[in-house]
């Protein structure tokens, strides 16, 4: 028996375990930047444990990673699992190993300026407000999710938005006298169809705004270091 068949049998076994332990989740596979839940693939049973495989450890605050027990033959890294009370995205489906999932506690959307400020003018405080962010819909365009319009609510991508480690300085704020702030870590799936850049601003479903200080893409998805900003 080759490795691929063993891998498939492991996923089949996890699927059988989920039939006893798990709840129903819709598998959503993003195909557009504007709405990650427009493409439902299937519904399956899934159970999640705090990376111990024995279901003995409780999850603690600030820990978004879980192991998922479900039939991985029906899913891909980057898929969302949307349940009645919780949403996860699949961070990685590595050969013969547990399926790594990230619990989502917020949804986020992002706009970018229609006309970027020339680098030669980036130090001119009269060009944009201090934060460098757009103040109106006419100055920006949706690139991830969608802004509220026409009486319709905003649409965001489910993400993990938790306190990070250490303090950060807003890369788009005025350079002189800018205080450091407590950082945030935002995690999004590899299925996000864009590349994050320092200075990007994300807005969550509570209206909080986060300026990206650094972005890392790996086989487990996006990790963004960000600070909360106020304009």
Show which residues each predicted segment covers.
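Short, intrinsically disordered N-terminal pre-domain segments
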Residues: 1-20, 230-231
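Short Lys/Arg-enriched alpha/beta "domain-start" segment
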Residues: 15-24, 30-36
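Short, conserved turn/kink motifs that form compact alpha/beta structural patches or helix kinks used as
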Residues: 30-231
């Amino acid at each position: 028996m080759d490795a691929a068949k063993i891998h498939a049998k492991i996923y089949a076994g996890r699927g059988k375990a989920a039939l006893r332990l798990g709840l129903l989740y819709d598998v959503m596979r993003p195909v557009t930047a504007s709405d990650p839940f427009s493409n439902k693939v299937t519904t399956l049973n899934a159970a999640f444990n705090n990376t111990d495989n024995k279901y003995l450890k409780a999850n603690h605050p600030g820990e978004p990673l879980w192991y998922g027990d479900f039939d991985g033959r029906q899913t891909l890294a980057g898929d969302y699992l949307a349940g009645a009370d919780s949403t996860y995205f699949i961070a990685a489906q590595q050969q013969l190993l547990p399926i790594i999932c990230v619990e989502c506690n917020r949804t986020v959307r992002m706009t970018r300026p229609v006309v970027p400020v020339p680098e030669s003018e980036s130090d001119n405080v009269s060009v944009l407000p201090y934060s460098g962010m757009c103040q109106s819909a006419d100055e920006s365009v949706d690139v991830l999710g969608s802004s509220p319009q026409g009486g319709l609510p905003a649409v965001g991508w489910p993400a993990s938005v938790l306190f990070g480690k250490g303090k950060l300085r807003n890369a788009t704020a005025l350079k002189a006298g800018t205080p450091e702030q407590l950082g945030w870590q935002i995690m999004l799936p590899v299925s996000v169809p864009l590349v994050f850049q320092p200075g990007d601003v994300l807005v969550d479903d509570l209206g909080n705004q986060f300026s990206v200080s650094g972005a890392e893409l790996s086989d487990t998805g996006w990790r963004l270091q960000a600070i909360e900003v106020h304009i």
